[in-house]
Amino acid sequence: MATDLTAHFDANADRIRGELFDFLRIPSVSARSEHDADTRRAAEWLRGAMQRAGLRAELLDTEGHPVVLGEWRQAGADKPTVLVYGHYDVQPAEPLELWDSPPFEPTVRDGRIYARGSVDD
């Protein structure tokens, strides 16, 4: 299976990287109300990505930012359930002077992607 995934990524690397960069360009800073629309746009982007991957996906509105729920139930009732839990928002990028490139413009340096939200701890 790992070989299949590697082959798939190799064959689609430019498209996959482009989609990731599109997502990383969204300043989904949930801690700042001026980015509420951006945060919703990130949720909508994620829902669309799930749908393109064949999942049933929806946004669930909350008192805060929407939850993105996606599911794929074709494996069969006798198969285990897998839950992936994460977040699509980011923290503020300040202080900006510590960035070598704009935080919401993905940049590749030394084979690594630099952008706000490209990794998490």
Model regions: which residues?
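Acidic/His- and Gly-rich active-site-bordering loop/insert found
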Residues: A2-D120
